[in-house]
Amino acid sequence: VTLAAPIQLAATVNEHLAQISNTLIYSAMAVYTLAFFAYIAEWLFGSRSKVARTAAALTAPKTQETAAAAQGPAVTVKSAGGTAVLERPKVVVRSAAGSRDVPDGPGAHGGDQQGDLYGRIAISLTTLAFVVEAAGVVARAASVERAPWGNMYEFNITFSTVAVGVYLALLALKKNVRWLGLFLTATVLLDLGLAVTVLYTASDQLVPALHSYWLYIHVSTAILCGAVFYVGAVGTLLYLFKDSYENKLATGGTPGRFASSVLERLPASATLDKFCYRVNAAVFPLWTFTIIAGAIWAESAWGRYWGWDPKETWAFITWVAYACYLHARSTAGWKGRKAAYIALIAFACWLFNYYGVNIFVGGKHSYAGV
């Protein structure tokens, strides 16, 4: 049997398993909602103390503080009646790319113990929601005895499961990504809400063109790439906000209280930038393989490797955009915000290739099911 051979599908749909899958997906959404509010509580309690509000300055290396003290700050002389007042200027320390990361999670920045407790509860709830959602995906697959990504609804629920799995895997590897939890659960809830309200399709068998083992190879890698690109895009957005916040502080500006309480909880902008680059660079070769696998499948299904079908075209545009980002990130004058904008454009191309092409553009890849 070759990889291009058709796969054997179940003749009927197990409606009982399909209903169990729906129940599990809704249950996962409920647990994600609880996790989201737990993350909010962590950020609120973790940012209320004076120590927490000045946490950004505390993340700078002590060597910088020692050097600044040795040099001695400049002073401003003010006249207060007949007395000369020496005023120490405000010093804003900005973490450099080589400085250490901030402690993991908002509660680690000096917030109270209750904030840390909420953070641990949030992680536990996220893990529980991930397990429940994964069970829902498996039940969906079992109901039709095939891979659970034959339409947009199935792709969405599998995509969000993998995205949360990537986040939890990074936590398990002791990576400093706990700050992603709040934003991840919020967007996963949006993704699942869209899936169950707009994209929902009842369990059914695949269209004939998808009866191939390449379905397991090509689409699974596309889902994994999208999930990792998504994590990188969330980090890139946070990097842009954090960089603006640091720039405002460096120029003597005073950010709003809400911005300060939220953005100072994040790692330094240089750390966020490095994280996003590593994430996107790590998955880019797999995206290259995804496109190649799709071309091989296209030759088997339609007798040609490439035909500039809208889905193929936008997959290639996405590849070019991420290649430009990786090149810009290593080019002097294009690092930082300029490269970040390219990364967001690249992810926007990926999103359009999925939502825009599937829903609004016709072609040989019209398997949305909506």
Residue ranges and their predicted role:
Residues V1-G303, G307-V370:
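Polytopic transmembrane helical bundles with strong interfacial aromatic enrichment
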